[in-house]
Amino acid sequence: MIVRIYPSEISGTIKAPQSKSLAIRLIFLSLFTRIHLHNLVLSEDVIDAINSVRALGVEVKNNSEFIPPEKLEIKKKFIKLKGSGTTLRMLIPIVAAIGGEVTIDAEESLRRRPLKRIVEALTNYGISFSSSSLPLTITGKLSSYNIKISGDESSQYISGLIYALHILNGGSIEILPPISSKSYILLTVDLFNRFGSNVKFYGNKIHINPNNLVEFQGEVAGDYGLASFYALSALVSGGRTTIVNLWEPKEYFGDHSIVKILKEMGATSEYLDGKWYVEAKDKYSSIKVNIDDAPDLAMTIAGLAAIAEGTSEITGIERLRIKESDRIESIRKVLGLYGVGSEVKSNSILIFGINKRMLSSPITDCLNDHRVAMMSSALALVNGGVITSAECVSKSNPNYWQDLLSLNAKISIE
């Protein structure tokens, strides 16, 4: 797919894309209780989660209703994922808790992602692994209810262990510092407690005392990280937008911080009663911000930093190298295509903002990374541009291009 973008000014109201982080967690909750998700958007990552719970015995009706099995067991000996890192990293400890043997594989982008920490941890508790990367055969059953794991590689392992210890009727997790993306662990803890469980997270320890979980019926709330590209598009193009279907920002949840970050850079950016109001200003300020707790915000911040006055610095970027693409290099490449300079340091990237009228009109290949396409499309609204392999947005937000059209973006899709 090729998308051609012409100079446009964004305006209008748009519904935030559903949170894939929340959708995947809700789908995995169907291992324990009935879940009915209204109007579920079937992004590639969500489909990976659906196929995973189906392989563990969950009955799935119309890709929206999920009925737990009487007994959890591995129904399929081979689970093929597409590209969902969240699904993969949560699935590994879950199948280890159920016990048996299963092989997991995925597309090349996921094969490149490290699994070292979860393999190291579970090897100490009765699980055998064929390797520390995909394709991966997992054999055995967790032999302990008290797990130690390093927290530096991915928070998704810890979220998966919370599910695993619910399968084992309780236990504890000790996370060896540093703890990356702690807010996503807190999201999982909060979700289980909302459904009636008893999960406590103090310092670096999580204690799980399961209760019967209540059923859920409703729609998945919007995703601040994905919605931020609509906000970025409005700010870069000189427009305004209102983004709806967002839950109230939590103090702990990193992605919500984008509302405040854009405001600190000089934009009108306010949340009120489920709506995020965004309006462009004539100029934006540079910023220094640490994104270790919310790495998915890097490209939105980089996009606005490209046209901000002065030099911005995004720190805490180490884990950007193990996303769908090497996002540190992807940010540098996209910025360079638009004529914006940048410099990578040991754990930060400097972005040297320019007047937006000086932005180039390049051709950008999305590098099989949905956020590359979204960042580039926002910058292209100033002087135009072309996105190739533009179908990559289907990983998280299949409706992205149509949404831009509804916001008065001038684009053609080939």
UniProtKB/Swiss-Prot annotation:
<feature type="binding site">
    <location>
        <position position="296"/>
    </location>
    <ligand>
        <name>3-phosphoshikimate</name>
    </ligand>
</feature>
<dbReference type="GO" id="GO:0003866">
    <property type="term" value="F:3-phosphoshikimate 1-carboxyvinyltransferase activity"/>
</dbReference>
<comment type="pathway">
    <text>Metabolic intermediate biosynthesis; chorismate biosynthesis.</text>
</comment>
<feature type="active site" description="Proton acceptor">
    <location>
        <position position="296"/>
    </location>
</feature>
<feature type="binding site">
    <location>
        <position position="20"/>
    </location>
    <ligand>
        <name>phosphoenolpyruvate</name>
    </ligand>
</feature>
<dbReference type="GO" id="GO:0009423">
    <property type="term" value="P:chorismate biosynthetic process"/>
</dbReference>
<feature type="binding site">
    <location>
        <position position="323"/>
    </location>
    <ligand>
        <name>3-phosphoshikimate</name>
    </ligand>
</feature>
<feature type="binding site">
    <location>
        <position position="113"/>
    </location>
    <ligand>
        <name>phosphoenolpyruvate</name>
    </ligand>
</feature>
<feature type="binding site">
    <location>
        <position position="85"/>
    </location>
    <ligand>
        <name>phosphoenolpyruvate</name>
    </ligand>
</feature>
<feature type="binding site">
    <location>
        <position position="20"/>
    </location>
    <ligand>
        <name>3-phosphoshikimate</name>
    </ligand>
</feature>
<comment type="similarity">
    <text>Belongs to the EPSP synthase family.</text>
</comment>
<feature type="binding site">
    <location>
        <position position="25"/>
    </location>
    <ligand>
        <name>3-phosphoshikimate</name>
    </ligand>
</feature>
<protein>
    <recommendedName>
        <fullName>3-phosphoshikimate 1-carboxyvinyltransferase</fullName>
        <ecNumber>2.5.1.19</ecNumber>
    </recommendedName>
</protein>
<feature type="binding site">
    <location>
        <position position="371"/>
    </location>
    <ligand>
        <name>phosphoenolpyruvate</name>
    </ligand>
</feature>
<feature type="binding site">
    <location>
        <position position="181"/>
    </location>
    <ligand>
        <name>3-phosphoshikimate</name>
    </ligand>
</feature>
<comment type="subunit">
    <text>Monomer.</text>
</comment>
<feature type="binding site">
    <location>
        <position position="395"/>
    </location>
    <ligand>
        <name>phosphoenolpyruvate</name>
    </ligand>
</feature>
<keyword id="KW-0963">Cytoplasm</keyword>
<dbReference type="InterPro" id="IPR023193">
    <property type="entry name" value="EPSP_synthase_CS"/>
</dbReference>
<dbReference type="InterPro" id="IPR001986">
    <property type="entry name" value="Enolpyruvate_Tfrase_dom"/>
</dbReference>
<dbReference type="GO" id="GO:0008652">
    <property type="term" value="P:amino acid biosynthetic process"/>
</dbReference>
<dbReference type="GO" id="GO:0005737">
    <property type="term" value="C:cytoplasm"/>
</dbReference>
<feature type="binding site">
    <location>
        <position position="156"/>
    </location>
    <ligand>
        <name>3-phosphoshikimate</name>
    </ligand>
</feature>
<dbReference type="InterPro" id="IPR036968">
    <property type="entry name" value="Enolpyruvate_Tfrase_sf"/>
</dbReference>
<dbReference type="GO" id="GO:0009073">
    <property type="term" value="P:aromatic amino acid family biosynthetic process"/>
</dbReference>
<feature type="binding site">
    <location>
        <position position="21"/>
    </location>
    <ligand>
        <name>3-phosphoshikimate</name>
    </ligand>
</feature>
<feature type="binding site">
    <location>
        <position position="155"/>
    </location>
    <ligand>
        <name>3-phosphoshikimate</name>
    </ligand>
</feature>
<keyword id="KW-0057">Aromatic amino acid biosynthesis</keyword>
<dbReference type="Pfam" id="PF00275">
    <property type="entry name" value="EPSP_synthase"/>
</dbReference>
<keyword id="KW-0808">Transferase</keyword>
<dbReference type="InterPro" id="IPR013792">
    <property type="entry name" value="RNA3'P_cycl/enolpyr_Trfase_a/b"/>
</dbReference>
<comment type="function">
    <text>Catalyzes the transfer of the enolpyruvyl moiety of phosphoenolpyruvate (PEP) to the 5-hydroxyl of shikimate-3-phosphate (S3P) to produce enolpyruvyl shikimate-3-phosphate and inorganic phosphate.</text>
</comment>
<feature type="binding site">
    <location>
        <position position="156"/>
    </location>
    <ligand>
        <name>phosphoenolpyruvate</name>
    </ligand>
</feature>
<feature type="binding site">
    <location>
        <position position="154"/>
    </location>
    <ligand>
        <name>3-phosphoshikimate</name>
    </ligand>
</feature>
<feature type="binding site">
    <location>
        <position position="327"/>
    </location>
    <ligand>
        <name>phosphoenolpyruvate</name>
    </ligand>
</feature>
<dbReference type="InterPro" id="IPR006264">
    <property type="entry name" value="EPSP_synthase"/>
</dbReference>
<keyword id="KW-0028">Amino-acid biosynthesis</keyword>
